[in-house]
Amino acid sequence: MGEQKQTFIEHLTELRKRLIISFLAVGVGFAGSYVVSKQIFNFLAIPLQKALPPDSTMIFTSLPEAFFTYLKVSLLAGIFVASPMVLYQVWLFVAPALYSHEKRYVVPFVIISSLLFLAGGAFGYFVVFPYGFKFFMSFATDYIQPAPKLKEYLSFCSMLLITFGLVFELPVFVLFLTKLGVVDAKMLSKNRRYVILIIFLGAAVLTPPDVVTQVMMAIPLMALYEVSIVLAKLVGKKKARAQDSR
């Protein structure tokens, strides 16, 4: 019992160490990002600025709103900058509990997941934002003019960028479910038509009402789903070979 208790205490000590290092990394990233927080926000605002009518500007309606907006920008950027160090600390904590064959998958998993998340965010920023903002601006009239607030715009952008980043994680998510036996390639292929319908409905809601834009948004999502099916097939074949060899 004493040895088990000591082992448990060692785990808590190790967890505390990794958390402290992770928080310090985020703190350093936050401090560095705050220096250029205005530039970061200006970069996020470029798609909206291009969609706004001439001479239009963003506003803040409470005295501390701009200050807290820049703090939030700094925190989000700090977490992003510190994410490699945070993931490394997670790896150092869980690695001793993994088998050698499991450790081989960790680095590729982290790299691929990170790249897919960045690709999703970039897709949202460079593709969806410009067309989406133009669509929203189309509702303006001579009597109704846009006056977007800093705080609301940052929240809106953050939500969409994170959403698109998570959507682009679809192949990794499906691969994980396939390994657990929850889904397989046959099931994914069988439901392809329903997934395509959902994708186009989502594209129709998020983009202006023209076919070209909707297709431009739907194609990457359809491609990700097809990649997921291919990965599920590969996992299924590997499982079948492993069972045959027993």
Feature roles, as predicted:
Residues 1-246:
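Membrane topogenic/interface segments and analogous intrinsically disordered interaction regions
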